[in-house]
Amino acid sequence: MPGSAGRTGEGRRPGGHRRELHPRRRAPRPADRAEPFAALLAQLIGTAPAVTAVPSLAPSPPWTGWDHSGSGLWPDRDDEGHDLNEVTGPAWVDEAARLVRQQMRRCDAPDKIGHGDWESQNIEWQNGEPLAVHDWDSVIAQPEVAIVGLAAAVWPAAGGPGEAASIAQTEDFLSAYQATAGATWTTGQIRLAWTAGLWVRLLNAKKDAARGGGPQLDLLGVEIEQRVARAGLHTGDWLSRGSGLAR
C-alpha cells in the first residue's frame, strides 16, 4: 500500500499465484465502526498512482466486474470458475444486475486505483492502527464512487457465510469516506456508490442461487428494495413480485 497506511501481506509468484510474506496475524480490529475502514481506503485511493502510470488492471475481479466486457449479463466466469449466465434466475437478481450495469456504464468519472475486496478479513489492525492489508490481486481501476460503493457494501465481512454490510453500515461508510476525503458528493454520486455496491451483493446472491440458495441470497432478498431505492434504479413492479421469493 502506498504511504504509511499499512503494508501488504501478500506477494505474487510467477504465474500470478499469491504467497504469504508473513503469517497472517489476527490483530484486534477497531470497534465495529466504519470510520477507520473508510479512512484507510481514502488514504489508499488518495495516494495511489494514476491509472495511466501502471499496467492495465483490467479485467476487474468478477465481484467488482459490472464493467466486464463479456457478452452476457454476468462475467464469463465468477471467482470460482463458474458461468453464472448459465444459471436460471432468480429473475429479480438478474434484472437488478442488468439495471446496475446500465446505470454504472453511464458514469463518466475518471478511473482511480483502489482495492476491490475491502472486507475486514483482509485488513489487520494493531492498537487501532492499520497493520497490513491483504488480497492485493483485487486491485481495480474504476471510478472513485464505484470503488467506495463496493467497499461500503461489504466492509464488515470477516469471512463467515452471509456476512456483509447492513443498510446502516453502508450509509455510515459512505458518510465516513466523504468526511475523511474532504468531499461532499452529489446525490448522483451517492446513488452511483449504492449502485456499484449492489453489484457485489447481487453476484454473491447469484452464486448462492446456483447452489440452490444461501445466506447471501436470503439477506439481499430482505434488503433489495432499500438498496435499489438508494441507488435510484427504476424497478417497475418486478421487484415486489420477485424479491419476496427470496425471503
Q: In which residue ranges do the predicted regions lie?
A:
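N-terminal membrane-targeting/anchoring modules of bacterial envelope and secretion proteins
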Residues: 1-2, 22, 62
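Conserved structural core of kinase catalytic domains
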Residues: 5-36
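A cross-family kinase active-site recognition segment
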Residues: 27-88, 109-111
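ATP/Mg2+ or Mg2+-diphosphate-binding catalytic cores
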Residues: 73, 175, 202-247
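Mechanochemical coupling/switch segment within NTP-driven translocation systems
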Residues: 90-100
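Active-site acidic catalytic loop and adjacent metal/ATP-binding pocket
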Residues: 101-146, 158
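Active-site activation/catalytic loop segments of kinase-like enzymes and analogous catalytic loops
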Residues: 145-182, 196-215
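All-alpha amphipathic helical-bundle segments outside canonical DNA-binding/catalytic cores
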Residues: 184-196
